[in-house]
Amino acid sequence: MAGLDYPNLVLIRRKARGLAGRMVAGWQHERMIPEFVRRAVDLIESAGPEPFFLYFPMCPPHNPIVPAPEFVGKGGVTGRESRYADWVYQGDHMLGQILDALERTGLAGHTLVMATGDNGAAKRPYPPLREAKSSIYEGGHREPFVARWPGKIQANSVSHRTICL
């Protein structure tokens, strides 16, 4: 299985084989993810009065787990899961930078912001949901969805409706 997330990875009989070398000379995930955020913020800051659409698929919390050096040790967790916690912390920071840019530019008051996952938990079920990623059961496709739209969505409101993006 090869996909957009891992174009240099091929799964053969449940064994991962990476292709030799990097896809692009000099590519470093640790440095590129902050660059993606910088470019998103630049787009927001240069948007002007016309409506625009920004799709920003964040890498955290997906693999590869490669927090930038400035986030190492910031996740508040020690031991085996510390690197993953740093990665999730970096993801939170990334979203915060985008929200801050919307505030600074005065766009936050009339901008719909959505944050969601793309599938259920990857490796194990999380009760009360049954199963995990790639399953037809709820644990394979139910994930959090958060939306902020001042004047349209009440802050701290909860909806139990099914949505589809």
Residue ranges and their predicted role:
Residues 37, 41-45, 92, 99, ...:
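Non-transmembrane alpha-helical segments in soluble domains
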Residues 54-57, 114-116:
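Short beta-strand segments
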Residues 45, 71-73, 88:
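Beta-propeller domains with acidic blade repeats across secreted/periplasmic ectodomains
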Residues 13-25, 71-79, 149-153:
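Short glycine/proline-rich turn/loop motifs
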Residues 64-67, 76-81, 86-87, 93, ...:
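Histidine-centered active-site microenvironments of extracellular/periplasmic hydrolases
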Residues 1-51, 58, 64-67:
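Formylglycine-dependent
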Residues 21-34, 76-90:
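The substrate-binding groove and active-site-proximal loops of carbohydrate-active enzymes
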Residues 30, 34, 139, 159-163:
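Short, solvent-exposed loop/helix junctions and linker helices
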